[in-house]
Swiss-Prot record:
The keyword Manganese does not apply. The lineage of its organism: Archaea, Methanobacteriati, Methanobacteriota, Methanomada group, Methanococci. A lipid is attached at C19 (S-archaeol cysteine). This is Putative flagella-related protein F. One of its GO terms (cellular component) is archaeal-type flagellum. Residues 1-18 form the signal peptide. The modification N-acetylcysteine is found at C19. It comes from Methanococcus voltae.
Amino acid sequence: MGFSSTVGSVLILTTLLICSVYLYSSVDVVSSKFTNAYSQHAESLQGKMNENLELVEITKLGDDIVLKLSNNGTETLSCEHWTVMYNGTPKAYIANQSYVAPMDTVQISINGSTPCRISLISEYGNKYYYKL
């Protein structure tokens, strides 16, 4: 009777040890992913707060509408990550440079006619609306 209870308790303790090692490794991986996602979210919110685009000028050149925007924020922005919507539909655009440094300007031209509503969604999700 004494031998079988000893073997049973050793077997249960070994099983608990193996399960706890597996559980610890799973929790460690999830915790690492959670921490990484949280830091990315914090960086995104910081970028959103530090971003500020201002419309300087709108001109109509033939079939194109040219927007001149000034980056008055503290973030360097990538024009490739922007979305331009023309009357509520996404529209292809051409920017005269790939990146806009703080206190720099960029020109965006889209094919369209006036009157219209143009919405610019930046890489951090800020929305800027313009009505022509």
